[in-house]
């Protein structure tokens, strides 16, 4: 993603269920509901690059800046045959509320049961007894392999896709 994005400030109590998926590994399939309350799975995008980014919380400053950065660069992703999917542990209703205020042409997926974030080994951060997905981005090739894992906001994800 291009641009500087502020990180969400949460308490430092993170854990990952099974260790983060590494570059070179197969991306686990998942099916989650989008902000439109429709199921979306990784296999829906076979043959395309997938930029799967996990973020802590809808409508927070850092997460909004990050989402706007992906939206700003959406034409670059389209030109690279790549789609963007955002995932948080928020509920579909939270995504609907956010999308009623901000316009995103990509899907926001709800993972309130932590199934996808656990499968990918995304650490969960606990803050005031609530859990949030840690910020991570997975660049997945058209054949379903993870080619890059970004554990911080990466300003050159389009460049990563282009180089691969």
Indicate residue ranges for each PLM-predicted region.
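N-terminal "domain-start" segment that seeds a small globular fold
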Residues: 14-43
């Amino acid at each position: 993603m291009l641009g500087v994005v502020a990180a969400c400030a949460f308490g430092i109590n993170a854990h990952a269920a099974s260790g983060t998926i590494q570059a070179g590994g197969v991306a686990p399939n998942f099916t989650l509901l989008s902000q439109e309350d429709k199921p979306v799975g990784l296999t829906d995008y076979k043959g395309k690059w997938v930029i799967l980014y996990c973020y802590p919380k809808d409508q927070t400053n850092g997460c909004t800046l990050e989402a706007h950065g992906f939206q700003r660069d959406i034409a670059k992703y389209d030109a690279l045959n790549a789609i963007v999917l955002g995932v948080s542990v928020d509920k579909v209703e939270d995504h609907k509320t956010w999308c009623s205020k901000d316009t995103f042409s990509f899907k926001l997926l709800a993972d309130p049961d932590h199934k996808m974030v656990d499968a990918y080994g995304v650490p969960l951060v606990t803050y005031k007894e609530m859990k949030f997905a840690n910020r991570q981005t997975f660049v997945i090739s058209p054949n379903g392999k993870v080619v890059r894992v970004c554990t911080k906001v990466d300003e050159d994800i389009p460049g990563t896709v282009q180089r691969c």
